Amino acid sequence: MTASQRTLMVMAGGTGGHVFPGLAVAHRMEAAGWRVVWLGNPAGMEATLVPKHGIPMEYVRFGGLRGKGLKTKLTLPVNLLRACWQSLGALRRVRPDVVLGMGGYITFPAGVMTALSGRPLVLHEQNSIAGLTNKVLAKLAKRVLVAFPGALPHAEWTGNPIRAELAHTEPPQARYASRGGPLNVLVVGGSLGAAALNEVVPRALALLAPGERPRVVHQAGVKHIEALKANYEAAGFAAGEDVRLVPFIDDMAAAYAAADLVICRSGAMTVSEIAAVGVAALFVPFPHAVDDHQTTNAAFLADAGAAVLVQQRDLSAELLADWLRGQSRASLADMAERSRSLAKPEATDEVARVCAKAAGANLEQLQ
């Protein structure tokens, strides 16, 4: 670290929805010559993932209360006090010029101590319904940013920071116009798999006449791939040219860009990535998401005719098959264009600029 080098501390943890957008901003700031240090939980996924990106870490132990037992609730005051003390120690060691909170339980004690120590705090909320931590910290932050309009009062709509390759794909009009033959459908279950999609999609395809069936790439997660194969076999399909079953996808930008339609859950980053690429989507929100935020995430696109939202309780093979029969590449291309128009492809740069400005830095450093 040079005497003139500025430092950003990113605090985020718990889930990829918090960590990955934080990494996008971290790399953008590093490219502009900033030093970046990450504050996270040693037991969280960030402790494994972030060091692989060459970013040093500070650790604070703190967990949430949702779904926890009486013992956790009774020990909360002690655990919170300890986490605040650990956070203060990290802030004193790192001496950041600005702190960016991307969400997760760890953000609360660290965010409070950032504000009390007089350092500028920038918050970013990825979901359409803000979590409790960000609702509280928004009152202490210098700048509050949101991925979806209205998630927090008096916030700036920047969108979600995403990987650069997703923000620079070919426009949907050109992609869709160059294709012929059956529709290309991408089904994304994520690393955890999505049992409802894994069960319903094969049965829906079986209800379609051979000439109506799309080409399908179905991703289900390593732990669920064998069950998925069994579901397709039970529906009368053998994996082949028109049905590819994969445990994971290395290049999501290419997978999204090759699809006419994506069938998936509606986590914040998934919705943002689909809009950035510009691809039609049928969202089936995870029904047990906190505050049902996946429904409102999906509604942001669905209400504009840029996607279709089907609740899991309403999803059936018959409904999906009927809906697919009514789609054409032209109708899906229109949906994709609407989706692309709602994207914020410059979100990573915008969040980085806000952080720089909060630290009193020259924004030209991020051009």
From Swiss-Prot:
GO terms for cellular component: plasma membrane. It is found in: Cell inner membrane. One of its GO terms (molecular function) is UDP-N-acetyl-D-glucosamine:N-acetylmuramoyl-L-alanyl-D-glutamyl-meso-2,6-diaminopimelyl-D-alanyl-D-alanine-diphosphoundecaprenol 4-beta-N-acetylglucosaminlytransferase activity. CDD domains: GT28_MurG. It is a peripheral membrane protein. Cell wall formation. Catalyzes the transfer of a GlcNAc subunit on undecaprenyl-pyrophosphoryl-MurNAc-pentapeptide (lipid intermediate I) to form undecaprenyl-pyrophosphoryl-MurNAc-(pentapeptide)GlcNAc (lipid intermediate II). This is UDP-N-acetylglucosamine--N-acetylmuramyl-(pentapeptide) pyrophosphoryl-undecaprenol N-acetylglucosamine transferase. The lineage of its organism: Bacteria, Pseudomonadati, Pseudomonadota, Betaproteobacteria, Burkholderiales.
